Swiss-Prot record:
Region of interest called Disordered, as start-end residue ranges on this chain: 200-224
Complexes and interactors: Has multiple subunits with at least A(3), B(3), C, D, E, F, H, I and proteolipid K(x).
Main location: membrane
Organism: Halobacterium salinarum (strain ATCC 700922 / JCM 11081 / NRC-1) (Halobacterium halobium)
Record function comment: Component of the A-type ATP synthase that produces ATP from ADP in the presence of a proton gradient across the membrane.
Family designation: Belongs to the V-ATPase D subunit family.
Protein name, entry field: A-type ATP synthase subunit D
Superkingdom classification of source: Archaea
Keyword Membrane: yes
Biased composition regions of type Basic and acidic residues, renumbered to the chain: 200-209
Location within or outside the cell: Cell membrane
GO terms of biological process kind: proton motive force-driven plasma membrane ATP synthesis
Amino acid sequence: MAQDIKPTRKNLMEIEDRIDLSERGHDTLEQKRDGLIMEFMDILDQSQDVRSGLEGDYETAQQKINMARAMEGDVAVSGAAAALEEYPEITVESMNIMGVVVPQIESTKVKKSFDKRGYGILGTSARIDEAADAYEELLESIVLAAEVETAMKKMLTEIETTKRRVNALEFKLLPELHEGKEYIDQKLEEKEREEMFRMKKVKDKKEAQEEAADEAAAAESTGA
C-alpha cells in the first residue's frame, strides 16, 4: 500500500524509475501481444485450409480403400498393406515466431513408387494402387495438420500469457506505483509547507526580537 512507503526524495526517485520501466515494459508487451495475434490469425487461416484439405483427403482415402476392398477383397488389401518394407520417417525441428518456439515437422518416404511398396506391380490392381496413393496423401496432410495445430496452440498459450502480463502491469502494478508516487508527492509537499511555516515563524520571532532590542536600545538612549 502507498502508506507503507517512506515519503523521501530517494523513494520518490526510485518509484519514478519503476514507473518509467514498467510503462516501457507495458508498451513492449502490448506490441508483442498485437504481433502474436497477427501471427496467430495467419496460422488460423492456414489451419482452416489444412483442416479442409485433411477432411477431403480422408474422405478420398476412405472411398479408395472401400472400393479396393469391394473389388479385390479384404485379404488382398491386407496383404498389400503388410508387404510394405520401407516406413515413412518423421523429423521434428523448431522455428521461432516472436519468441515462441513452434515445431517444423518434415515427413520423408511417404509417397512411394509402385516398386517401393513391397507388393510388386503384378498381382495387384489399380484399385489398390489408388488406395495407396490416397493414404500416402492423407498421411502428408496429417503431418501438416499436426504442425499447424501445435503451432496454433503454442501461439495461443503465449498470447494469453502476454495478455495476463499486460493486464497485471496496466491494472495492478502501474496504478499502485502511481498511487505511491502521489502519496510521496503529497507528503513531501506537506513537509515543505510545514518547513516554510516553521522558517517563517523563526524569521518572525527573530525580527520581533530584533525590533524589541532596537526599542530597548532606543529607550535606554532616551533615558540617558
